[in-house]
Amino acid sequence: FYRAAGAICGVVIEKHLSEVCTQHQIKATKKNPTINDYNELLKANNIVDIATWRNIQRLADLRNMCDHHKDIEPTKDNIEELIAGTDKILKTIF
């Protein structure tokens, strides 16, 4: 159930980044913003630094692997990285 775990992490990350943008009064222009859209907004408004921005990009890539790429199977290590990264985002980005 690696793909399902990755998809859930993606939803959690996206919701958290959306809430962070709301707290900082940052509005997304897209109707349905993605993790990457929120990540760009947070970077542009100096809420996250470059290292954090890159880490979020990596986690978004792992989430996309789980949701979209049927020819590439996520590994246990990929999902463990995604779960740990999700936990870190929730604890460190406000």
Give residue ranges: language-model regions.
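Long, hydrophobic, amphipathic alpha-helical segments used as structural scaffolds
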Residues: F1, V20-A28, K70-P74, F94
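Short, charged amphipathic alpha-helical segments flanked by flexible coils
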Residues: C21-A51
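Short amphipathic alpha-helical leader/targeting segments
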Residues: E14, I26, D77-E80
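Charge-enriched, short contiguous segments at helix-coil
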Residues: I47-F94
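Short, hydrophobic, well-ordered secondary-structure elements
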Residues: F1-C21
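Short amphipathic alpha-helical segments, especially helix-boundary/capping motifs
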Residues: E14-H16, D37-L41, A60-R63
